[in-house]
A protein has these predicted regions:
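Pepsin/retropepsin-fold aspartyl endopeptidases
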Residues: 1-137
Length: 137
């Protein structure tokens, strides 16, 4: 298993995003990405990415197939239905497909959260360090 820190950069090649800061959260079941203006049309979803710190991320409109809809308990403890997309995430040396929920994370420090379902049997999290994978690049 690859060792990662509690904060890492990830690549989302299908969205054209690279070196995006992500919180690694073993307490969260699923992964999520910050977006808004989520519009569902049939089995497709269109959403707008926002992060003024990351120029390639800010104001980017994306349309993808819906992977699933599921109820998720948010950080404030409320349960809400979310739309999930399925795209590859590169974390460290490896790339794996992941289901990622679309969520407004504007009050969160990091635009992406990587949950334990993605990390299970692949990564070991060292919570005393961050950006471990960057050092190996």
């Amino acid at each position: 298993m690859e060792v990662i820190g509690y904060i890492e950069t990830v690549d989302l090649p299908e969205l054209g995003l690279f070196d995006l800061d992500a919180k690694i959260d073993t307490g969260a079941d699923s992964s999520s990405i910050h977006c808004d203006e989520i519009i569902v049309e049939g089995d497709m979803v269109t959403f707008l990415l926002h992060d003024e710190v990351h120029p390639a991320y800010h104001g980017k409109k994306i349309t993808l197939p819906i992977a699933k809809r599921s109820r998720v308990k948010s950080s404030n403890g409320k349960s809400e239905e979310r739309i999930f997309i399925k795209i590859p995430i590169k974390l460290g040396c490896k790339t794996y497909d992941a289901e990622i929920s679309l969520s407004n994370r504007e009050n969160m420090k990091y635009p992406m959260l990587v949950g334990r379902r993605f990390m299970s049997h692949r990564y070991l999290v060292d919570v005393s360090h961050k950006y471990i994978t960057k050092k190996g690049k």
